Amino acid sequence: MKNNIGIIISNVGTPSHPNKKSVKKYLSEFLSDKRVIDISRFFWIPYLHLYFLPLKSYKSVNLYKKIWEKDGSPLMINSLNQRNYLINKFPNFKIELGMRYGDPSICVAIKKMIKIYNVNKLIILPMYPQYSCTTTASVLDSVCEVIKKYRNIPSIIFIRDYADNINYINAITNSIKKSFNKNGIPEMLIMSFHGIPKKYIKDGDDYLKRCNVTKKLVLSKLNFSRKKVIMSFQSKFGNIPWITPITSEVISFLPKKGIKNIQVICPGFSSDCLETLEEIKIQNKKIFKDNGGKKFHYIPALNYSKIHIECLANIIRTHLK
């Protein structure tokens, strides 16, 4: 039987507009996911809707407005471009974007693959280089929840992660080298990954190991002292312990140790988004400067750069063999 192949690329998602209604809807779906917030539903869901969302939505709207572009959210723009460039790489495949939260959803993407395109082989590529139960596993949860509604389903190839993929490592290394050439050699390079609660690591999530794998492989290709590289973790919220060191704490501390020139890259983000453009490029830059830092450069995510599209294409080809 001739293979009719479909590919779904999946990222976390984004509000459709930088207003309270859209942001609240998005955050409600995101923060209701037990993979993300693994505490008692009996306590969390009422607290989420009665207290947390009204306050968080208001604050988040202002943050989104800082990074919003005329064509929409940076994450959506980047993701749609990634899809379009992958279509050029695989003109005979059906390729859709399926966000974990918000639209276009995984549900709609799978429906197209089965009902419209009639694919018999489906590749799911979560756009998270390092596996975590909070991201990659949540995508798999959603895929399974949707796929069980259909009588006839395609063969499914689920790509767990690509933390050690040579093309990905080369792409990240290339971004760092380009920034060094453009902005000069920094005194310190910060590799900031999204943080997760320590409890998730203790319970078996190998996310921290996968981040370390990426860091080690990038440094093996980078002519830069390992003593001048710090791996840290961002986007902490809540009162429970998260993996450390925390990016904002590292960045505030460095100037006090005489480090006044740093560059920051976020290798775990395949597309620039709120966490990179606002939290790192704006918030953490201000933290660094307020504490006496002089030069701060954020190294952009791979987005839909030529090297990234080729990297993603190679990952897909590898799983087609």
From Swiss-Prot:
Classification via PANTHER family: FERROCHELATASE, FERROCHELATASE, MITOCHONDRIAL
Keyword Lyase: yes
Binding sites annotated in the UniProt record for Fe cation: 194, 275
Tree of life domain: Bacteria
Protein name as catalogued: Ferrochelatase
First-tier enzyme category under EC: lyase
Entry keyword annotation includes Lyase: yes
Organism: Wigglesworthia glossinidia brevipalpis
GO biological process, one term: heme biosynthetic process
Lineage per the UniProt record: Bacteria, Pseudomonadati, Pseudomonadota, Gammaproteobacteria, Enterobacterales
Keywords associated with the record: Cytoplasm, Heme biosynthesis, Iron, Lyase, Metal-binding, Porphyrin biosynthesis
Recorded metabolic or biological pathway in which this protein acts: Porphyrin-containing compound metabolism; protoheme biosynthesis; protoheme from protoporphyrin-IX: step 1/1
EC number of the protein: 4.98.1.1
InterPro entries associated with the record: Ferrochelatase, Ferrochelatase_AS, Ferrochelatase_C, Ferrochelatase_N
Family affiliation: Belongs to the ferrochelatase family.
Catalytic activity entry: heme b + 2 H(+) = protoporphyrin IX + Fe(2+)
Cellular component GO terms held in the UniProt record: cytoplasm
MF terms (GO), sorted A to Z: ferrochelatase activity; metal ion binding
Compartmental location: Cytoplasm
Pfam families, per the entry: Ferrochelatase
Function: Catalyzes the ferrous insertion into protoporphyrin IX.
